[in-house]
């Protein structure tokens, strides 16, 4: 929640709260304050929706999007409601011009790592699902997503880092989902900073965490998903050498990538560019200084960040690395979906028109198969021209006589399963290795 307008002003700010009754909530503050008067609160979802829209439209004004209201509740309630909505409106039922079907969903931050949401993602891992989720994850939770989740595009927003030295722990205890750790000396971490603990046993105390309210002096408070058990070896607060400010409250970084997806409109003059390294605007780049190992880990986990084009002498912010959780550039699955959707539409169009053309009806015979094969070849030729498929692509068809001999019950039912295509989606470069050989001996001219 965000609290504003309270006197004294120390009550104001944005906080994690605990709802205690239908009319009361609590939140943590450091120090003591006189009784407060006045003020208003704004639920997180209100400011988050505004931030989503602000970042989305910072990319341009040529697109619109829907806001799908799922009702009041927590992340579990929201994921359950969304699953019910998609089940009632599956993208497999979509036909051209239909409404209420959505290709991708930009979900709230609070859904990150939620067990119900993760279970829902498992329902959309098939190659024919054609449904995607843009998810803001964190340094503490990005490992919740697996490389089977081709439906998930995850991104970590630029985190808040402080500057602090390595500091040995003297205690670590767990209670009710939270760890309280004590450092040898004052650590310099403040609530809202991210920090790393290493070297503890059990390992559940280790990781990168968000400092919560109550972090001060030589005390660190952070959340963990389960009880690690009693500590037997105490580790260390890992040093951080470079400070970094968190994103502003008006930013929802992954909304920029969401816009980039929605602006795809494939044609021969508007080819589909790779998702990786795409320009995005109004977003904060992830800090790079001192984070080489972390950035390598995130890339290997197929977790995206906002970067810059500095390596190429370009000041724009860009998407790194543009992949879904299975490691494919988003355009890979966009291509697969485009081929499925357009093949269905164009073949259906040919069959329907063929049933309404007395001069040239479409029959289930060799000529009819040839005509459908030609229709599908046009689809694949367009995929090449639009930047979605690597040339060449050839559509094959089992000859009529062979097919009906091998599948005798299909002809009476009007079923033909003999069309096929194998192709490779088009993609861009990710890394170039360039070899330079330097010598002191000039070559003979």
Which stretches of residues belong to each language-model region?
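Surface-exposed assembly/interface segments
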Residues: 2-5, 15, 42-163, 188, ...
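Small/polar beta-strand repeat architecture
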Residues: 4-44, 164-194, 198-241
């Amino acid at each position: 929640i965000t609290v504003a307008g309270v006197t004294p002003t120390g009550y104001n700010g944005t906080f994690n709260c605990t709802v205690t009754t239908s009319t009361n909530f609590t939140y943590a503050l450091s120090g003591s304050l006189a009784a407060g008067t006045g003020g208003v609160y704004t639920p997180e979802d209100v400011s988050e929706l505004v931030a989503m829209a602000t970042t989305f439209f910072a990319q341009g004004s040529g697109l619109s999007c829907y806001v799908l209201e799922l009702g009041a509740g927590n992340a579990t309630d929201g994921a359950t409601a969304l699953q019910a909505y998609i089940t009632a409106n599956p993208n497999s039922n979509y036909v051209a011009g239909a409404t209420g079907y959505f290709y991708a969903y930009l979900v709230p931050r609070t859904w990150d790592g939620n067990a119900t949401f993760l279970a829902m993602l498992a329902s959309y891992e098939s190659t024919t699902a054609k449904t995607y989720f843009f998810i803001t994850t964190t340094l503490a939770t990005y490992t919740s997503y697996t490389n089977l989740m081709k439906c998930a595009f995850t991104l970590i927003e630029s985190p808040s880092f402080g500057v602090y030295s390595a500091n040995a722990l003297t205690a670590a205890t767990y209670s009710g989902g939270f760890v309280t750790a004590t450092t040898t000396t004052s650590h310099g971490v403040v609530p809202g900073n991210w920090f790393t603990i290493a070297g503890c046993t059990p390992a559940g105390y280790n990781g990168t965490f968000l400092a919560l309210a109550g972090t001060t002096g030589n005390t660190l408070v952070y959340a963990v998903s389960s009880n690690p058990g009693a500590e037997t070896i105490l580790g260390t607060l890992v040093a951080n050498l470079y400070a970094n400010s968190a994103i502003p409250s008006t930013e929802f970084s992954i909304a920029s990538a969401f816009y980039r997806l929605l602006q795809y409109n494939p044609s021969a003059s508007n080819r589909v560019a790779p998702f990786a390294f795409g320009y995005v605007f109004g977003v904060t780049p992830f800090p790079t200084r001192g984070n080489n190992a972390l950035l390598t880990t995130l890339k290997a986990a197929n977790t995206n960040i906002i970067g810059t084009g500095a390596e190429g002498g370009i000041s724009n912010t860009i998407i790194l690395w543009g992949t879904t959780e299975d490691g494919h550039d988003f355009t890979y699955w966009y291509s697969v979906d485009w081929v499925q959707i357009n093949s269905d539409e164009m073949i259906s169009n040919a069959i329907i028109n063929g049933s309404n053309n007395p001069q040239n009806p479409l029959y289930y015979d060799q000529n009819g198969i040839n005509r459908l094969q030609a229709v599908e070849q046009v689809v694949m030729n367009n995929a090449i021209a639009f930047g979605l498929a690597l040339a060449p692509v050839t559509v094959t068809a089992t000859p009529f006589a062979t097919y009906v001999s091998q599948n005798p019950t299909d002809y009476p039912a009007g079923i033909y399963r003999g069309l096929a295509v194998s192709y490779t989606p088009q993609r861009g470069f990710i890394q170039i290795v360039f070899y330079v050989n330097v010598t002191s001996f000039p070559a003979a001219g």
